[in-house]
Curated annotation (Swiss-Prot):
The lineage of its organism: Eukaryota, Fungi, Dikarya, Ascomycota, Saccharomycotina. GO terms for cellular component: peroxisome. It is found in: Peroxisome. Pathway: Lipid metabolism; peroxisomal fatty acid beta-oxidation. The keyword Cytoplasm does not apply. It comes from Yarrowia lipolytica (strain CLIB 122 / E 150). Keywords: FAD, Fatty acid metabolism, Flavoprotein, Lipid metabolism, Oxidoreductase, Peroxisome. It holds the Pfam family ACOX_C_alpha1. FAD binds at residues 149, 188. It comes from the Eukaryota. This is Acyl-coenzyme A oxidase 1. Heteropentamer composed of five different subunits.
Length: 689
């Protein structure tokens, strides 16, 4: 059987691949950070693909309980790597497998990143060693979860109501859930798996509240998995996505833990009840920053998968055409289809640059903090600088997490729509991918709240700059004097395609926005308290976060291109220009308001985006092949490497739904009685009357 009267998709795909004008491997190495990194990635992907337990080809038809069991089997298969992998290998493995199996990624990350990350970052070296000996890292007779969110509070850490009250007589903390609103909620791993949790609770000593701190609390007995005395746990059940994650609720009733179970790298409680607080509370939130940084990288990895599917399909799918043409037109050749997908491909590449920059900053800041002794007066200046950098990273990671996870959600759904009806099939991945993904826009900080937090941080950094104080590198441009201002003559075409101009245009827009908001804040705070003043500026704070994050992605993209091989630079530059100019289209108002561009410039930018889409069009297969994804990781027949989309799609549907019986299992019980029912007042309608 032929698949189409007018086209042979595999032949079409081969022709498209032949249009590539660069060495695909060079772009792959550029994205991964070099040939050595690419080889590491390929080895990890190969090991995942060869393990039958990790196969995801039949996942789309799993029910809730099957997904839970299957995910646990995969956790067991991957857990040995938690001990043998280096930090870098562990990160790669999690991100790569997480592209196609977000549930397993989540269950492992909750333990490894959030639980272990909290103990490593907020505990003393001695505490970390203690829990390692207990089996925490090896995941033997031990599984951890992260008990932060409550039924009544999520993003507001200061508002959490679980209490940890110090009992000096027993040298223990007593953990309590004071009311139903303080129930720990949405806790991944709690319902079935976890033996311990890192619990966020209010530290109460001698009747005084010292704020939210972290405590390691045993949940289940190791020998039989029964609940500890005073611990109540339930299953939250069916969610929108990530069915393989056993999210649960936890309540504590007078649960006693040793004083040493409080993580005391920063805040400390002595056996006599003396509390020593850290220089900055944000130092205790390292696990949250790590989670956000990971989500920025995940945004890139998940986006690249769905863009590969949509663009490969677009290069072989023909639909409609001009009159008299014997062949229908490839949908990738429709200008509007290019407009829908190619700026998103450029966005995906920009995400990678932002993710790498965030990861680098996180590692450097964390290493510097872990090397400091908070109690050493000689390190006071270094600690203060680390505090400033941590505050900036806390805010910056919030904004980046928000806008990249939103961006990925947009990419998944736009790619789904761009694949027409076939994008709605469960076997092409978009439905489960979207349902599994969008929780990223909510957990570890609701995106809108995070943007407001970042906007607040940007204003505070601007105040630091105005006072001549230290700020982190990524915000220093706000203090620069250079700026772009129109004289009414418009901007030449070559300037609109200049990386230097585009970077400075975004920095000017962001700088002006932040400084204007800072001026308004300084006026408001004369009559309002700081919190009220910031609330009055909520919309402005959001806009500050949006433009600052976009300029950061653009700046990072252009800076990274400078390190690329000469043969791929022109193609990467087209992507960067496309992303920057499309981003201006997305925020035209601010560039006009700030007198950076004229209405005529905007018209020219619209034309340049069209031109860049045409220029990138022939390279889309090479640019997506550079992601290095085999059909296993694509896991969608319409995105197959060889372009044989119809035969593979048809085969997949029939493999999962074999035509064994033309009658449904509910024929006798439901369908037959319905079809052969008798109506008491069955009258024939005479249409001629």
């Amino acid at each position: 059987m032929t698949t189409n009267t007018f086209t042979d998709p595999p032949v079409e795909m081969a022709k498209e691949r032949g249009k590539t004008q660069f060495t695909v491997r060079d772009v792959t190495n550029f994205l991964n950070g070099g040939e050595e990194e690419t080889q590491i990635v390929e080895k990890i992907m190969s090991s995942i693909e060869r393990d039958p337990v990790l196969s995801v080809t039949a996942d789309y038809d799993c029910n809730l309980q099957q997904a839970r069991k299957q995910t646990m089997e995969r956790v067991a298969a991957l857990s040995p790597y938690l001990v043998t992998d280096t930090e870098k290998l562990s990160l790669w493995r999690a991100q790569l497998h997480g592209m196609v199996d977000m549930s397993t990624r989540t269950r492992l990350s909750i333990h490894n990143n959030l639980f272990i990350g909290s103990i490593r970052g907020s505990g003393t070296p001695e505490q970390f060693k203690y829990w390692v000996k207990k089996g925490a890292v090896a995941v033997k007779q031990f599984y951890g979860c992260f008990a932060m969110t409550e039924l009544g509070h999520g993003s507001n850490l200061k508002g959490l109501e679980t209490t940890a009250t110090y009992d000096q007589d027993s040298d223990q903390f007593i953990i309590n859930t004071p009311h139903i609103g303080a129930t720990k909620w949405w806790i991944g791993g709690a319902a079935h798996t976890s033996t311990h949790c890192v619990c966020f609770a209010k530290l109460i000593v001698h009747g005084k509240d010292y704020g939210t701190r972290n405590f390691v609390v045993p949940l289940r007995n190791v020998h039989d998995h029964s609940l500890k005395v005073g611990v109540s746990i339930g299953d939250i059940g069916k969610k929108m996505g990530r069915d393989g994650v056993d999210n649960g609720w936890i309540q504590f009733t007078n649960v006693r833990i040793p004083r040493q179970n409080m993580l005391m790298r920063y805040a400390k409680v002595s056996d006599t009840g003396v509390v020593t607080k850290p220089a900055l509370d944000q130092l205790t939130y390292g696990a949250l920053i790590r989670g956000r940084v990971s989500m920025i990288a995940d945004s890139f990895h998940v986006s690249k998968r769905f863009l590969t599917i949509a663009l490969r399909y677009a290069c072989v799918r023909r639909q409609f055409g001009t009159s008299g043409d014997t062949k229908e037109t490839k949908i990738i050749d429709y200008p509007y289809h290019q407009r829908r997908l190619l700026p998103l491909l450029a966005y995906c590449y920009a995400m990678k640059m932002g993710a790498d920059e965030a990861q680098k900053t996180w590692i450097e800041t964390t290493d510097r903090i872990l090397a400091l002794n908070p109690n050493d007066p000689a390190q006071k200046n270094d600690l203060e600088k680390a505090v400033t950098d941590t505050k900036e990273l806390f805010a910056a990671s919030a904004g980046m997490k928000a806008f990249t996870t939103w961006g990925c959600a947009k990419i998944i759904d736009e790619c789904r729509q761009a694949c027409g009806g076939h994008g709605y099939s469960g076997y092409n991945g978009f439905g489960q991918g979207y349902a599994d993904w969008v929780v990223q826009c909510t957990w570890e900080g609701d995106n809108n709240v995070l943007c407001l937090s970042m906007g607040r941080g940007l204003v505070q950094s601007a105040l630091q700059i105005l006072a001549g104080k230290h700020v982190g590198a990524s915000i220093q441009y706000v203090g620069d004097k250079s700026k772009i201002s129109q004289n009414g003559q418009g901007t030449p075409r070559e300037q609109l395609l200049s990386p230097e101009f585009l970077v400075e245009a975004f920095r000017t827009a962001s700088r002006n926005n932040i400084l204007r908001t800072t001026d308004k804040y300084q006026e408001l705070v004369k009559t309002l308290n700081p919190d009220q003043a910031f609330e009055e500026l909520s919309q402005q704070r959001f806009q500050c976060a949006r433009i600052h994050t976009r300029q950061h992605l653009i700046s990072s993209f252009y800076a990274r291109i400078a390190t690329a091989k000469d043969d791929i630079k022109p193609h990467l530059l087209k992507l960067a220009n496309l992303f920057a100019l499309w981003s201006i289209e997305e925020d035209t108002g601010i560039f006009l308001r700030e007198n950076i561009l004229t209405p005529g410039d905007i018209d020219l930018i619209n034309s340049l985006v069209d031109e860049l889409c045409v220029a990138v069009r022939d390279q889309v297969i090479g640019l997506t092949d550079a992601f290095g994804l085999s059909d296993f990781f694509i896991n969608a027949p319409i995105g197959s490497y060889d372009g044989n989309v119809y035969e593979k799609y048809f085969a997949k549907v029939n493999q999962q739904n074999p035509a064994t019986n033309p009658r449904p299992p509910y024929y006798e019980s439901t369908l037959k009685p319905f079809l052969f029912r008798e109506e008491e007042d069955d009258e024939i309608c005479d249409l001629d009357e």
